Regions:
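Residues on the lipid-exposed face of transmembrane beta-strands in outer-membrane beta-barrel proteins
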Residues: 29-33, 50-56, 68-72, 97-105, ...
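Cleavable N-terminal export/targeting peptides
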Residues: 1-24
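Helix-adjacent hinge/juxtasegments
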Residues: 87-111
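Short glycine/proline- and aromatic-enriched beta-strand/turn motifs that initiate or cap beta-hairpins
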Residues: 20-64, 70, 77, 194-204
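Predominantly the C-terminal beta-signal and adjacent terminal strand-loop region
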Residues: 65-79, 147-150, 154-205
Length: 205
């Protein structure tokens, strides 16, 4: 057992040593728009996210690139649905984490890299009664929180394409375009509702 453990540790160390030279930490800032087609809610809201992620080389130009983005948004309940809200008509404030789990393929062109990616996004949200809203609406906050995870509303297949420039040695900067497909809405026949489009400014080292 001890021998197997040592072999496993040695293998992990060897694998990490292979990847460490190209392992990158990525910081991001991203304006995002969430499509809302229901007039009972806010017009498609624009929010801003801040994120951190990693790029781990796999083989050839393939990479594994998990990324976590934090943002917040207001929500309300209308027509028995959870909808984005304007600040004047809000019920809940929900801090949110979008966890991207994509694989990508880096295409090098001298000091320029194009990286298409595809994967899954997991949208983690929890709402709190917004400041200034009556406690009588607490039940609506419970409804909102249940709605976040009902009928796969948390699962977002995603596609992305990044454009990065090598500034010096391992320091890179660029931007990416992302699209998140709301699986919960698709299953209800509302493909566009809750779709997310994001422009991501990236810094990697």
């Amino acid at each position: 057992m001890k021998k197997k453990t040592l072999i496993f540790v040695a293998f992990c160390f060897f694998a990490f040593s292979l990847f460490s030279a190209d392992f990158k930490t990525v910081f991001s800032l991203s304006p995002q728009i969430t499509i809302n087609t229901d007039k009972a809610g806010a017009p498609s809201p624009v929010k801003f996210g801040v994120g951190i992620g990693f790029e781990l080389p796999l083989f050839k130009n393939m990479i594994f690139a998990p990324h976590l983005t934090f943002s917040t948004n207001y929500y309300l309940v209308a027509n028995n649905k959870v909808l984005p809200a304007e600040i004047e008509n809000r019920t809940a404030l929900a801090p949110s984490l979008m966890l991207d789990i994509p694989f990508g393929y880096k295409i090098p062109i001298k000091n320029f890299y194009i990286t298409p990616k595809i994967g899954l996004g997991t949208f983690l949200r929890y709402g709190f009664l917004a400041n200034g809203v009556s406690k009588a609406e607490s039940d609506l906050v419970d409804f909102i929180n249940k709605g976040f995870y009902k009928d796969l509303a948390w699962l977002y297949p995603m596609a992305e394409i990044d454009f990065d420039f090598l500034i010096k040695e391992k320091l890179m900067a660029g931007f990416g375009l992302k699209y998140y497909l709301p699986l919960g809405s698709v299953l209800k026949g509302e493909t566009l509702q809750n779709s997310i489009f994001a422009l991501q400014f990236r810094f990697a080292f």
